[in-house]
């Protein structure tokens, strides 16, 4: 799963 916020990229 890609978050719009940087550093909050979780699958």
UniProtKB/Swiss-Prot annotation:
Molecular function per GO: DNA binding
Q: Which cellular compartments is it found in? A: Nucleus; Chromosome
What is one cellular component GO term in this UniProt entry? Answer: chromosome
User: Where does it primarily localize?
Assistant: nucleus
Q: Keywords on this record? A: Chromosome, DNA-binding, Nucleus
Biological role: Histones H1 are necessary for the condensation of nucleosome chains into higher-order structures.
Family membership: Belongs to the histone H1/H5 family.
The protein, known as: Histone H1.A2
């Amino acid at each position: 799963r890609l978050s719009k916020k940087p550093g909050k990229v979780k699958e």
